[in-house]
Amino acid sequence: HFAGQPATTEKPWYARPSHRPAQRQALVIGAGLAGCASAASLAARGWQVTLLERHAEIAQEGSGNPQGVLYLKLSAHGTALSQLVASGFGYTRRLLQNLQRGRDWDACGVLQPAYDDKETERQAGLAEAFPATLLQPLDRAEAERIAGVALAGGGLFYPDAGWANPPALCRWMIERPGIELRRHQQPLQLRRENEQWLAFDGERLLAQAPVVVLAGAAEAAQFDQSAWLPLKRIRGQITGLPATERSTALQTVLCAKGYVAPPRDGQHTLGASFNFEQTDPAPSEAEHRSNLEMLQEISPDLYQRLQADTGATAKLVGRVAMRCTSPDYLPIIGPLADAHAFAEAYAALAKDARQVPETPCPWLDGLYVNTAHGSRGMITTPLSGELLAAWIDGDYKLHRKAPKGDKPVYALFNLAKDSQEKADLASRE
């Protein structure tokens, strides 16, 4: 059966859910950046929000690093992801004004060194496509003056970017009326009864509300209703290096194949590794070594100033977290549909995307997701939380220019299409 309300003939098959709960109450699962942003935006609109976190404190997974970089990986071609990143950067930047500069964030800028010919060409395209207020091409002398350390060449400078402490942003977002944080709560099952979503740990009811937002990164796919979400984990490890008298000369974040930030609380953060194979939560010497090699490539001068040594990694401190991404690296934000009903209703659409279905999308009333922010969470989660809250609250003005790829229904359609293509290939063998 279809859980969604029937759409009118004027609406497309994927028209937004028309479901409106009688009570403005929501349950958000996961208290990292995505969950805290979703909870904050809903509370700002007058909703009562229960925020469930499985750990003893918030921001313990991918949102727990001491320094997150406001890194704008843009495209000169105006892709959906590039649009989201550019918009999200400005939104996050405004929120950070509420935190203590120097301790919780710093607008020290981000410098992307042009480390090879391909990167130099990419940066030249960006410099033509975006205003100088957002990014500025620098020659070597200018780059070294701004960075405070010696570099191999010039690069692209983002003057309003910098670093922030993700846990501090999470705390600020949820320190407001209308949000109840419940720690040590890990729902394993969702059931819908009498217009309410019930979150259970075994047979123990943890919380209930007419609206649920799944915001626990890859854990968002642990429920029966969301198991189809095409999420993947990528292990990332950061390395902490004690600041030295000479390393404090670094004045901006350097971000190439990895990043190194100016010191916070007497320590520089560098990283993060990308490991698609391992899921071990313990820091490894091999990835510490990889991070140090990355630092040496970015700036041999800074490497020496930090007294770094790729042969001495046993005593280094670090942290491991799992990034969560989607196949096209766009975040997945919006309402969830019933995967089985979707597959039945749109089997023909999977074979021929040009068809125009008449059956309205089988939405799961009141169930939403905000996940797959990868390594861009500092930039994309606050705006995504606002987009999602607007959707839930029936305010669609923000969605007129939102990238289509952010909606789970597109991921479900692509999943169905991929399955059909695989079936077609199998039938030909």
Task: Give each language-model segment a name.
Residues Q307-G394:
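C-terminal catalytic lobe of FAD-dependent flavoproteins
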Residues Q67-A147:
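Dinucleotide-binding Rossmann-like beta1-alpha1 core, especially the glycine-rich loop
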Residues L156-W197, D201-G202, L206-V211, A215:
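Helical element adjacent to the flavin cofactor pocket in flavoenzyme catalytic cores
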